[in-house]
Every structure is written in C-alpha cells, then in structure tokens.
Amino acid sequence: MNFDMSKLMQQAQKMQEQMKKAQQERENMEVIGESGAGLVTVTMTGKYDVKSVSIDNSLMSEDKEILEDLIAAAVNNAVKKVEENSTASSDIYKMAKDAGIDLPSGINFPFK
C-alpha cells in the first residue's frame, strides 16, 4: 500500500476549510424560539447568545411563575433550534468521509 503524505495533507486542509465554513455559518445563524403560542419569543445566535426577548403585553398581568416558565420554554426552544439547524457536527463526518478519513461514530466535537 502506497502512503501519499501530500494527498493526506491536501485532504486535511480541505476538511479544515470546510469545518471553518460550517463554524462560520453557525456563528452567523439566528433562530427564534417561542412558547405560549408565540406570546414569548427569544432570538438567539448560533453561539447561544440571547439577542432579544419579546413578551406579549397580554402576559403582563399573568402570574410571575407562569411568565418565568414561558421564558424558560422559549429559551429552551431556541437552543433546540440552534442544535437542529447546526450543520457543524453532522458535516464533520461527511467532510471526513469526503477527505477519505473514517471517523468512529459517537465523537463529541467541542462546538456541538
């Protein structure tokens, strides 16, 4: 079996570029999580930063605990959407395969 170091380096560089692109796409992502049929919305970035919280005026007369629960649910919904829309971790396996590298399944990458 011939081992071509230059080909391996080219494949690794290609995979690194693809991973960088996937990370940038995630960083630029924005999602809106909601609860209470849209009465509470949370805008979150792909880096899990909450940019805004919107609470419908009709909830201002509600019990404090109800409002807290709705806010928590909206944040959790936004987190779920970031994870669902993030291509980074699933694309790593595809990128590695395209580069001729077999990764074992179940690896937890640090940016997932």
Swiss-Prot record:
<dbReference type="GO" id="GO:0005829">
    <property type="term" value="C:cytosol"/>
</dbReference>
<comment type="subunit">
    <text>Homodimer.</text>
</comment>
<dbReference type="InterPro" id="IPR036894">
    <property type="entry name" value="YbaB-like_sf"/>
</dbReference>
<feature type="region of interest" description="Disordered">
    <location>
        <begin position="1"/>
        <end position="27"/>
    </location>
</feature>
<feature type="compositionally biased region" description="Basic and acidic residues">
    <location>
        <begin position="17"/>
        <end position="27"/>
    </location>
</feature>
<dbReference type="Pfam" id="PF02575">
    <property type="entry name" value="YbaB_DNA_bd"/>
</dbReference>
<protein>
    <recommendedName>
        <fullName>Nucleoid-associated protein FTW_0607</fullName>
    </recommendedName>
</protein>
<dbReference type="GO" id="GO:0043590">
    <property type="term" value="C:bacterial nucleoid"/>
</dbReference>
<comment type="function">
    <text>Binds to DNA and alters its conformation. May be involved in regulation of gene expression, nucleoid organization and DNA protection.</text>
</comment>
<comment type="similarity">
    <text>Belongs to the YbaB/EbfC family.</text>
</comment>
<keyword id="KW-0238">DNA-binding</keyword>
<keyword id="KW-0963">Cytoplasm</keyword>
<dbReference type="GO" id="GO:0003677">
    <property type="term" value="F:DNA binding"/>
</dbReference>
<dbReference type="InterPro" id="IPR004401">
    <property type="entry name" value="YbaB/EbfC"/>
</dbReference>
